[in-house]
Amino acid sequence: MSLFDHSVSELHKKLNNKEISVTDLVEESYKRIADVEDNVKAFLTLNEENARAKAKELDAKIGAEDNGLLFGMPIGVKDNIVTKGLRTTCASKMLANFDPIYDATVVQKLNEADTITIGKLNMDEFAMGSSNENSGFYATKNPWNLEYVPGGSSGGSAAAVAAGEVLFSLGSDTGGSIRQPAAYCGVVGLKPTYGRVSRYGLVAFASSLDQIGPITRTVEDNAYLLQAISGVDRMDATSANIEVGNYLAGLTGDVKGLRIAVPKEYLGEGVGEEARESVLAALKVLEGMGATWEEVSLPHSKYALATYYLISSSEASSNLSRFDGVRYGVRSDNVNNLMDLYKNTRSEGFGDEVKRRIMLGTFALSSGYYDAYYKKAQQVRTLIKNDFENVFANYDVIIGPTTPTPAFKVGEKIDDPMTMYANDILTIPVNLAGVPAISVPCGFGANNMPLGLQIIGKHFDEATIYRVAHAFEQATDYHTKKASL
C-alpha cells in the first residue's frame, strides 16, 4: 500500500506520531516517479536535490505544535506557475530555459505551509489544449490506460495524482483545464471563483478567465489545499478581498434540503449517453440523502464555446506578445533585421495551437472586426453570467457532467481543432461566469475510463460545492478506485 493511499489528515497524524518521516514521503514520490514516469510523462522538471534537503530540515521539526496539516506533504506544480530557481517552461520551447527569480503567491503560501515541491508538471503549451498533446516537449498519458489522453491543459497535474506520483497538485483552469483532466483521470479538481486565488506568478493565457486550483485524490484533501492558497493578494489586483471561510467545517455528509438545478442543455445534444446516465445516477444518490433537483435552462450556454474562443484568444494574443526574443523567451539566431528577430523567434518558439489562437485573437481585435467579434463576445458573456445568476436565485448548486464523454485515445482528435474544442462545452460556461466548480469521479465509460460529475456553485461559495461533493463521495466508492498502472 502506497503512503499516498492515505489522506492528508491520516499522513499528518502518522508524521506527528513519528510513524513516518517527511523523507519517507519524498522518497515515496520519487520512487513512484522512477517506476512509472517513462510511461506517464507527467513531469517536465524534477526538484530532487532541493526537495530532499527540505525534507531533511522538516524531519527535525516533526511533532512541533505549529506544524499545519500540509506539513511535509509532496506536491506537483503545473509548469505555468513560476517557481524561484526551478525551471518554468509553460511546456513551450519559447521558455525552455526560463528560471524564474520569484515564486508565485500560491507557491509562496505552500512553502510557508511547509509543503515540498517535487517538480513541475507537463501541460498543453501555454495552457492551450484539451489533451496534453500540445506540449512542446512530449505528451502525458492517462494512467488508467496509456493509449488515452489525460485531458488538458493540466494533464500532467491530474495524471501525476492519479498515478500516485504526488499526493496532490496545482493546476490552472481557463476553460476547464483543471476539471476536464480531473474527470478523465478519475481524481478531484476544483476551479475556484475568479478572484478567490491569486494569479500572481501564473503565466497569463487569458487574464479574465485564468484561475489556479487544486487537484487531489479526495474532496477533503482538495479543501485543505484550497484553504491554504486562497485569499486576497496585493500583487494581484483581481484577487478578491472576501473572507475565506472554513471549507472543512461543511464536510458533514449532510445535503438534506439542498436544492439542485440540472440544466437541460447539459444533458442534451452533444452529451454522450454514458455521461448523461452517470449524472442521473448521481442525482439519485443525492436524492436518497434528502436533496431535491429540478431541470432548468441556461439558454445562452449554446453560445459559450464561440464566446470563449473569441475572448480567450484575444487576451492570449495580447498576453503572448511579450514573447518576442527581446523581453522574454528564446531568441532566434536566424535573423538579418529586427523584423526577422520578432518573426523567426515566434515562429520557432511557438507550437501550432498557440499560433492558431494568436492568429484568431489578433483577427478578433483588429480594426473593423473588434465590434463584430470581441465586443459582441463580451456582451454574450454577460448574458451567460446572468443565466447563472438567475438559476442561483432559486437553487443552491448546479449539477451536470464534467465532460460529454470519457477520455479519448491519443491522436484521435489532434488534427480536428473544432472536435477537440468541443470537449470543453460543459466547463467553459463556468469560466465565463466566474463561478466555482468541482469535478468528482462518478462512474466509468464502456472503455473503462473515468467519468466526472461537475458541481457548480455561487460566487465565492466553494463551501457548498465541497459539501455536496464530499457527501456524494462518501456515499459512493468511485474515489477509492485507482489506476492499475
Swiss-Prot record:
GO MF assignments: ATP binding; glutaminyl-tRNA synthase (glutamine-hydrolyzing) activity
This enzyme's EC code(s): 6.3.5.7
Enzyme type, top EC level: ligase
Superkingdom of the organism of origin: Bacteria
Keyword terms: ATP-binding, Ligase, Nucleotide-binding, Protein biosynthesis
SUPFAM superfamilies: Amidase signature (AS) enzymes (SSF75304)
Record InterPro entries: Amidase, Amidase_CS, Amidase_dom, AS_sf, GatA
Enzymatic reactions: L-glutamyl-tRNA(Gln) + L-glutamine + ATP + H2O = L-glutaminyl-tRNA(Gln) + L-glutamate + ADP + phosphate + H(+)
GO cellular component, as recorded: glutamyl-tRNA(Gln) amidotransferase complex
Enzyme active site: 78, 153, 177
The keyword Flavoprotein belongs to this UniProt entry's keyword annotation: no
One example of a Gene Ontology biological process annotation: translation
Keyword check for Nucleotide-binding: yes
Similarity section: Belongs to the amidase family. GatA subfamily.
Assembly behavior: Heterotrimer of A, B and C subunits.
Cited function: Allows the formation of correctly charged Gln-tRNA(Gln) through the transamidation of misacylated Glu-tRNA(Gln) in organisms which lack glutaminyl-tRNA synthetase. The reaction takes place in the presence of glutamine and ATP through an activated gamma-phospho-Glu-tRNA(Gln).
Protein name: Glutamyl-tRNA(Gln) amidotransferase subunit A
Organism field: Bacillus cytotoxicus (strain DSM 22905 / CIP 110041 / 391-98 / NVH 391-98)
